[in-house]
Every structure is written in C-alpha cells, then in structure tokens.
UniProtKB/Swiss-Prot annotation:
Its cofactor is Mg(2+). GTP binds at residues 166-173, 191-195, 213-216, 283-286, 314-316. CDD domains: Obg. An essential GTPase which binds GTP, GDP and possibly (p)ppGpp with moderate affinity, with high nucleotide exchange rates and a fairly low GTP hydrolysis rate. Plays a role in control of the cell cycle, stress response, ribosome biogenesis and in those bacteria that undergo differentiation, in morphogenesis control. Belongs to the TRAFAC class OBG-HflX-like GTPase superfamily. OBG GTPase family. It comes from Shewanella sp. (strain ANA-3). GO terms for biological process: ribosome biogenesis. This is GTPase Obg. Keywords: Cytoplasm, GTP-binding, Hydrolase, Magnesium, Metal-binding, Nucleotide-binding. GO terms for cellular component: cytoplasm.
C-alpha cells in the first residue's frame, strides 16, 4: 500500500435540532398548555487512533466527512433524537492541525485514543421551557446551534525510539536491515529510500525497540533540494538520533562537510529536534585498514568538535551492529518513562452548556405582565403545530 503521511480533510459536525411549538389538545382538556419538546444535539466528529491503520491514503480520496444532524423536537414533550457521532479511524501517531489557524488540536499516540475535532450543535428548546406563572401559553422556541466546521490537516508522525540521519548512500537502510527484519530497498545510487521505514530491533530476548529510517538529506534540503525535509517530522518522537556517516564516500566528498551539512539542515528544521541526544556512527569501516580507519575517524571527530558518543560499524558485514543495538537498548531503558497522559475517555466541556439560558431570561424579563394572552378565549383556537 502506498505510504501517505499527510492529508487535508473537511469535517462538519451535525447541527442541533430545533425546539417545537406545540400545545396539548385532548378531549375535555381545553387549556392543556404547552407541550413542545426540545430538539436533539448534533453529532460530533472524533478522530480515533487505530493500530490496524498505517497510512492516511483513504483520506486523500474521501475528504468530506459529516456527522448526523439532531432531530427537531415534537409535540407531547417528545425530544428529538441526538445525531450520531462520526468516528474517523487514523493511524497511531497522527497529529491533527487546524488548516486555517495552524493550531495543533492534538496528537493521537496510543491505540484507542479519541480526539474531538468538531463539536455538534446544541439542541433548540421547545415552548414548554418558556412556560412561567405569567406566560402560560408561550409561543417561543429556539433553533439548534450550527455544528462546528473545520478544515483539518492530518500528519502521520511515525512512533519510533531511534531515528537514523545521514546523507544519501550513507548506509542507513543497510544498517536497519542488519539489526532488524525490515527489508528496505538497498542500491548504489542516491535516494534509494523514498519513504520512511520502520524496523523492530531485538538485542535481547523479550526486549526490543523501534528504529526509523528516513530518506537521506542533502545540503539545501530546507529550501527543497533533494526530497526536502518533509520526512524529518518522523524523527520528532524519537528518543535518540543516530547520525550515520560514510567514512569512505565513493564520490570523494569529505565526511566532515557531509556531517556539518546534516546538522545544519536539522537546525534549520527544528532546534528542538537538533537538541535531541545524538550519536555519531561511522559506517563502511570494512573499506579501510584498521590504522587508517582510526586516523580518519579521529580527524572527523576533532574537526567537528564532537564530544558525544562515537561508534564504528560496517552495516554490510554487520561488524559492530549487534553491540551498537545493545547499547541503544540500554540507553533507551535508562531514560525516564514518557509521560502518557492521553485519556481516551476524557470528557470535553460542552461549548454551549449555557447557550440558551440568556434567551430564556431575556424572554421572561421582557414579558409584559399586563398582557397575558393566556386568558383570551381565542388562545386555544389557534392552529396547533405538530411536528412528526
């Protein structure tokens, strides 16, 4: 299935049903009074994380999503049915953004987590609600409020513990093949990897972590060169980054310049991402003699002014890959647990809880006590409105 990590959709919550103006009409009960019921609330639109989904491709072709409208109220104090909520299933790791205001509405990071993205309209009130000691035959009602309408930008950010950074052909895909069962395409030309790949690494029985491989970066990626930086967002949730450096580039470029270019593009994209824990991993060590390898690694580390962890591996021959995977596992386990405060059942305060109270108070306040049409004999000869 094609990997799609971005989609723009339009969601419309259901409008609230209107209240009903109706009067009780029964034999031998000439002055039955009002019995118009309230309308139903409109359905809301939710996003729900589902681990059985792994792409947003379905939302590229189905862009408009509407919840049900609430039914109008009826006579005999019958309340209209509330509209059915619409639940849209998205992959775990999806971020919802208001496309007009760029406001981040929320991240769905756990299976089953729900996010309200469009609230249904509040129901209208029937004329029974306006009955009072001075207004015993009210003909007032309120309409349901419109449901929220939003244009949403959905972004899928892969959930991984370790992210791989590097120039094209640095050996990132070969490394992920060496430490996991992932099988990304590997070839001797740039940009072999066109979409992110995930692999599960099991350094020890029963203990594992997830590693993400993204397409390679080149200098100028922030301005759109190569595949740009659109895939860097998939590293935002990683807990550590591995900067893979080709110690013996086939095109003769200096590894120092390549490493600086990657760091520069990372800082342009997000200083927060650039500040994540990062290890330097020199790949293709099998192409050099041991003394030459040590000398070259020492030169690159010195010129970069690097003071962090440094590792030397050969992803092709798998030299050093198992040891590196074990050290990654130990590092991840040493980190404090992530704060997962997502509550799928959390209630959202209703935006229009007190919407109608002002209308009721205003009508009762403006009502003229001296004009009580309840005592007019014609009051109960008016046409009664029944809503089916």
């Amino acid at each position: 299935m094609k990997f799609v990590d971005e989609a723009v959709i339009r969601v419309e919550a259901g409008d609230g049903g209107s209240g009903c103006v109706s009067f009780r009409r029964e034999k031998y009960i000439p002055d039955g009074g009002p019995d118009g019921g309230d309308g139903g609330d409109g359905g809301s639109v939710y996003l729900q994380a589902d681990e059985n989904h792994n792409t947003l491709i379905e939302y590229r072709f189905e862009r408009f999503h509407m919840a049900e409208r609430g039914e109008n109220g009826r006579g005999r104090d019958c309340t209209g049915h509330s509209g059915k909520d619409l639940i849209l299933k998205v992959p775990v790791g999806t971020r919802a953004i208001d496309d007009e205001t760029e406001e981040v509405l929320g991240d769905l990071t756990t299976h089953g987590q729900k996010l309200l993205v469009a609230k249904g309209g509040f129901h209208g009130l029937g004329n029974t609600r306006f009955k009072s000691s001075t207004n015993r035959a009210p003909r007032q009602k309120t309409l349901g409020t419109p449901g929220e309408v939003r244009s949403l930008k959905l972004e899928l950010l892969l959930l991984a513990d370790v992210g791989l950074l590097g120039m094209p052909n640095a050996g990132k895909s070969t490394f992920i093949r060496a430490v996991s069962r992932a099988t990304p395409k590997v070839a001797d030309y740039p940009f072999t990897t066109l979409v992110p790949n995930l692999g599960v690494v099991n350094p020890r029985p029963g203990q594992s972590f997830v590693i993400a491989d993204i397409p390679g970066l080149i200098e100028g990626a922030a301005e759109g060169a190569g595949l740009g930086i659109r895939f860097l967002k998939h590293l935002e949730r990683c807990r550590i980054l591995l900067h893979i450096i080709d110690i013996e580039p086939i095109d003769g470029t200096d590894p120092v310049d390549s490493a600086r270019a990657i760091v520069g593009e990372l800082e342009k994209y997000s200083p927060k991402l650039a500040s994540k824990p990062r290890w330097l991993v020199f790949n293709k060590a099998d192409l050099l003699l041991e003394d030459e390898l040590k000398e070259k690694v020492a030169r690159v580390v010195k010129e970069l002014g690097w003071e962090g962890d440094v590792y030397t591996i050969s992803a092709y021959s798998r030299d050093g890959t198992k040891e590196l995977a074990t050290k990654l596992l130990d590092f991840i386990q040493s980190l404090p647990p992530e704060d997962k405060d997502a509550n799928p059942d959390a209630e959202v305060e209703f935006k229009w809880d007190n919407y109608h109270q002002a209308n009721i108070d205003a009508i009762n306040e403006d009502y003229d006590d001296e004009f009580d049409d309840d005592f007019d004999d014609d009051d109960y000869d008016v046409e009664v409105i029944y809503q089916r």
